[in-house]
């Protein structure tokens, strides 16, 4: 059998998290319409009859000089070098622009281990032929047989990509037991679900100005309930007010939806105490950036 690590790369909102969740059959990475909601190198594990793929979902690659974005770029580059293979996902509903060309430049020395998924091929706005032409000029050593038109959301073309990726991996025993689909710890998964729900409940500048943190987590009732005290952090008092909402309606909804999502993931109930705090200009603080993006 073959087994190894596959790094997923692409522009923000190219469908990387959706692909990972669909391929693994479980919720591993948070999904939203807001670009760059993945801040960490998240592992998802897929087992097939031919072997095991350990996927790393990297942050959406986006050139920017902001501290947080620079850290996310660093994570993406490091994971590319570490992977046994690379899956490059492209959103066919968007123009093939400078960000795609920047990613292609990173992949030039990695063409022998790269597979490309043209995502959202089911949409009428798909520009598959034009994108393929661009790719073949920028990455001439990637054979056309390694370029797939897929829909991560509808689970179309996923199995074909998985089969090819398995072939690119080295021969060896599985890296993880077959019943494991992610190596994320409990606290990390809780913070990601809370952050996802906060993003889905907000708009404008708030999704990029927030992060979640778990203060306490204790098991009760003989392992049947996990009690969690967590906080959502924003940069301004005005953002805090919006996140709480009139009559605390917004934060209450975030808490309830988070508990419902967590119940789907864990074999026990999660009781969540969720509050909002202000951490002024946290996106400029190295210790916070290091804490939430690793």
UniProtKB/Swiss-Prot annotation:
InterPro entries: G_ERA_dom, GTP-bd, GTPase_Era-like, KH_dom-like_a/b, KH_dom_type_2, KH_sf_prok-type, P-loop_NTPase, Small_GTP-bd. One of its GO terms (molecular function) is small ribosomal subunit rRNA binding. The keyword Cytoplasm applies. PROSITE patterns: G_ERA (PS51713). Residues 57-60 are annotated as: G3. Residues 119-122 are annotated as: G4. Pfam families: KH_2 (PF07650), MMR_HSR1 (PF01926). Residues 150-152 are annotated as: G5. It comes from the Bacteria. An essential GTPase that binds both GDP and GTP, with rapid nucleotide exchange. Plays a role in 16S rRNA processing and 30S ribosomal subunit biogenesis and possibly also in cell cycle regulation and energy metabolism. Monomer. This is GTPase Era. It comes from Treponema denticola (strain ATCC 35405 / DSM 14222 / CIP 103919 / JCM 8153 / KCTC 15104).
């Amino acid at each position: 059998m073959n087994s190894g690590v596959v790094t997923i790369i692409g522009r923000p909102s190219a469908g990387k998290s959706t692909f990972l969740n669909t391929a693994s059959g479980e919720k591993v990475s948070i999904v939203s319409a807001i670009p760059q909601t993945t801040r960490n190198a998240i592992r998802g594990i897929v087992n097939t009859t031919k072997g095991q793929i350990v996927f790393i979902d990297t942050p959406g690659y986006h050139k920017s000089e902001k501290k947080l974005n620079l850290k996310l770029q660093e994570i993406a580059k490091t994971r590319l070098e570490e992977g046994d293979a690379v899956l490059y996902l492209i959103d066919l509903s968007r123009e093939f622009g400078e960000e795609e060309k920047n990613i292609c430049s990173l992949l030039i020395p990695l063409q022998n281990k790269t597979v490309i998924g043209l995502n959202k091929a089911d949409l009428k706005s798909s520009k598959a032929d034009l994108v393929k032409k661009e790719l073949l000029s920028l990455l001439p050593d990637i054979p056309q047989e390694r370029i797939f038109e897929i829909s991560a959301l509808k689970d179309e073309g996923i199995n074909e990509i998985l089969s090819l990726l398995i072939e690119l991996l080295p021969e060896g025993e599985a890296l993880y037991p077959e019943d494991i689909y992610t190596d994320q710890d409990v606290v990390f998964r809780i913070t990601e679900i809370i952050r996802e729900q906060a993003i889905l409940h907000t708009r404008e500048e708030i999704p990029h100005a927030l992060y979640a943190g778990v203060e306490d987590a204790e098991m009760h009732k003989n392992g049947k309930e996990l009690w969690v005290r967590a906080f959502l952090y924003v940069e301004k008092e005005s953002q805090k007010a919006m996140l709480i909402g009139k009559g605390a309606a917004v934060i209450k909804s975030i808490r309830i939806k988070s508990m419902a999502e967590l119940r789907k993931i864990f074999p026990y109930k999660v009781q969540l105490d969720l509050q909002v705090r202000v951490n002024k200009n946290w996106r400029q603080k190295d210790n916070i950036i290091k804490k939430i993006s690793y």
